[in-house]
Amino acid sequence: MSKKVVVIYSGGMDSFTVLHKAMQQGLTPYALTFDYGQRHIKEIEVAREVCEELGVHHKVIDISAINQLIGGSSLTDSSIDVAQGHYQQESMKSTVVPNRNMILLSLAIGYAVSLGAEQVYYGAHSGDHEIYPDCRPIFVEKMNDVAAVANYEKVEIFSPYLNNNKSGILKDGLAMGLDYSKTWTCYNGREKACGKCGSCVERLEAFAANGLKDPIAYEDT
């Protein structure tokens, strides 16, 4: 019987690749998707569809009540515009949800302990390091230190693409034969991707770097 692993799966291309990576490694993934009140709720719908198609264990957990305590992010507050441009720009800090990955990983670790799983996979990568403190190698290292002492059972947090950028993730996923039309990246909660937010810009750059056209629909195309 293969080992169980909890995969934090948003529905985006990074976690989509991580999910398949776990399966390729012969692990049994338990996908965990969080509704934290994000305006790009479409990613949850995509995650459900993918997991159903793959026959993967999947839970969608509503933690949107945290927004009674945590605010100031354009991802959860519709009164704040989602910044346009590249992630390296200072304006992209408006997309930071305070303490998000610490909260999500804490819940995922608890789920892993309950399942008897020894690892939690999540899709942090080098393109996130500039803006998101909770995607940096030092954060993963320190969270692993905490995870090692928080329970009787040790759970490792593993980010297979921590030192890869999005184009590298895409390259690996393409080598696995993955279909990225089954992913959602845009931070704006509209029917088509905007093509202008940091998440869209980075995604489009990744496809361009791999000499490909992005298979999802954009508003300006």
Swiss-Prot record:
Q: What class of enzyme is it?
A: ligase
The record's listing under Gene3D superfamilies reads: HUPs (3.40.50.620)
Q: How is the cofactor bound?
A: Binds 1 zinc ion per subunit.
For this entry, list what GO says about its biological process. queuosine biosynthetic process
Query: Which positions does UniProt annotate for Zn(2+) binding?
Result: 186, 194, 197, 200
Residue pairs linked by disulfide bridges in the UniProt entry? none
Q: Where does ATP bind?
A: 9-19
- Top-rank taxon, per record: Bacteria
EC number(s) given by UniProt: 6.3.4.20
User: Which InterPro entries does the annotation name?
Assistant: QueC, Rossmann-like_a/b/a_fold
Q: Does the keyword Transcription regulation apply?
A: no
**HAMAP family (UniProt xref):** QueC
According to UniProt, the name of this protein is 7-cyano-7-deazaguanine synthase
